[in-house]
UniProtKB/Swiss-Prot annotation:
Cofactor needs: Mg(2+)
InterPro entries: Pantoate_hydroxy_MeTrfase, Pyrv/PenolPyrv_kinase-like_dom, Pyrv_kinase-like_dom_sf
Keywords noted in UniProt: Magnesium, Metal-binding, Mitochondrion, Pantothenate biosynthesis, Transferase, Transit peptide
Binding site for Mg(2+): D83, D122, E154
Record-given protein name: 3-methyl-2-oxobutanoate hydroxymethyltransferase 1, mitochondrial
Catalytic activity: 3-methyl-2-oxobutanoate + (6R)-5,10-methylene-5,6,7,8-tetrahydrofolate + H2O = 2-dehydropantoate + (6S)-5,6,7,8-tetrahydrofolate
PANTHER family: 3-METHYL-2-OXOBUTANOATE HYDROXYMETHYLTRANSFERASE (PTHR20881:SF0)
Role noted for this protein: Catalyzes the reversible reaction in which hydroxymethyl group from 5,10-methylenetetrahydrofolate is transferred onto alpha-ketoisovalerate to form ketopantoate.
Length: 347
């Protein structure tokens, strides 16, 4: 009896030890498919905690693996795979042309590169407007096939509110988007700021409230006057994310290419929003590097010995030259011999 009790206690002690050594967080039931270190992976809980503490939430767009890695390294809270890829990656004048399949390619690339931020994927135009069931089906694909944690949809019409509610009820986190909604430029008459008169300003606040009621965990406020954004932020219990909406939102979002000053081409210069601060002129650095590369290749400066690392031993080279000559490739043998001589370090 005593021996059996000892064995049971030993097994229980080992189980407790394993549980304490587990990398699963204490407050979760299942580990999930991703590393669940609560000090690293950003979740809705982390965003809500930041919001309660009054700490601004940082959001930046990303569209591929390198940009996602940069966001991850910088400690950005939320990585948005935006349909703005239609403009800054694919070169279109609007966000309308990009397809769901194209968005999913961007989502998967970003998911491989950003391990810390909360990942949010835009629902592209034409993939959620017809019905709530279409919206849910699209949102499910963005999570299952794109590897996202949440989705974002634009607009505040009754059908959009219903769609947002249906997506949330399907178990998918949703960010709303009001103010300037680029997918609706046909109705808005272009990329025009909203909330600049009484009716429009009230509509911004009421629409944001309706999205909150539908279950959205956050709302993007785009291109509205700061007092309107401040009113919406004060009225809501969920965080607001501003873009061209002033400093009174719960957080801010900018497009990766815009804030880095990557696009120097006149096509993009004409659509770069004036509310965007450029924190770098990466485009100039890229242009300079490409021109320098072109010049060095043209002058046969690159690649030199230091960038030609793969060597062949003298004995193997001699044998290679002999074989070339046997095959009648005397000219090729001479070229190989001269190349070997030129690759020798200068004395």
């Amino acid at each position: 009896m005593a021996s059996s009790l000892t064995r049971n206690c030993s097994r229980f002690s080992k189980a407790i030890s394993v549980r304490f050594m587990s990398n699963l967080p204490e407050n979760t039931v299942y580990g999930g498919p991703k590393p669940q270190n609560p000090n690293q992976r950003v979740t809705l809980t982390h965003l809500r905690q930041k919001h309660r503490r009054g700490e601004p939430i940082t959001v930046v767009t990303a569209y591929d693996y390198p940009s996602a890695v940069h966001l991850d390294t910088a400690g950005i809270d939320v990585c948005l795979v935006g349909d703005s890829a239609s403009m800054v990656v694919h070169g279109h004048d609007t966000t309308l042309p990009i397809s769901l399949d194209e968005m999913l390619v961007h989502c998967r690339a970003v998911a491989r590169g950003a391990k810390r931020p909360l990942l949010v994927g835009d629902l592209p135009f034409g993939t959620y407007e017809s019905s709530s069931s279409q919206a849910v089906d699209t949102a499910v694909r963005v999570l299952k096939e794109g590897g996202m944690d949440a989705i974002k949809l634009e607009g505040g019409s009754a059908s959009r509110i219903t769609a947002a509610k249906a997506i949330v009820e399907a178990g998918i986190a949703v960010i709303g988007h009001v103010g300037l909604t680029p997918q609706a430029i046909s109705v808005l008459g272009g990329f025009r700021p909203q909330g600049r008169n009484i009716a429009s300003a009230v509509k911004v606040v009421e629409t944001a409230m309706a999205l909150q009621e539908a279950g959205c965990f956050s709302v993007v406020l785009e291109c509205v006057p700061p007092p309107v954004a401040a009113a919406a932020t004060s009225a809501l219990k969920i965080p607001t994310i501003g873009i061209g909406a002033g400093p009174f939102c719960s957080g801010q979002v900018l497009v990766y290419h815009d804030l880095l000053g990557m696009m120097q081409h006149p096509h993009h210069a004409k659509v770069t929003p004036k509310f965007c601060k450029q924190y770098a002129n990466v485009g100039e650095v890229i242009n300079k590097a490409l021109m320098e590369y072109k010049e060095e290749v043209s002058k046969k400066v690159f690649p030199g010995p230091s960038h030609s690392p793969y060597k062949i031993t003298a004995s193997e080279l001699d044998g290679f030259l002999t074989e070339l000559q046997k095959l009648g490739f005397d000219k090729a043998a001479s070229a190989a011999a001269l190349a070997a001589e030129n690759m020798e370090p200068s004395k």
